[in-house]
Amino acid sequence: MIIIGIDPGAKGGVAIYDEAEHKMILHKCPETPKEMAAIINTAKVKDENTFCVIEKVHAFPTDARSSAFKFGCNFGKWLGILGAYDIPTLEVTPQSWMKPLQPLPKVKTERKNQLKQIAINLFPENKITLSTSDAALMVVWYVNNE
């Protein structure tokens, strides 16, 4: 089975985990729907039995309207591509997938850096970045909770 983790923000990333090979492939979130689809296609071609966990996101009242709109558009593009490839998808809140990793810092930059370090410890063979760490950890959360 292939498990895809997606952090749909513009600075997010994609993690593709092959359970049979115990290998993780990471991508920074692509800029175009064509590039997004290419990543999903690669996973689906490798194994028809593919599942996705995507971070369920929403805009905050403090977000600028244009950035909130872009954020929502990116999320919608991912859902559309996953639907077109007929990939079952679970939307998970950040609170849910981060819960087993608590306690985490309240300050966003500190929390992001700690999440990155956790992912590096779990996947030392991969080049984990701030862009890809959340996606990788969502895959771990799914595997541990399926």
Model regions and ranges:
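Phosphate- and other anionic-substrate recognition elements at nucleic-acid/protein interfaces
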Residues: 1-146
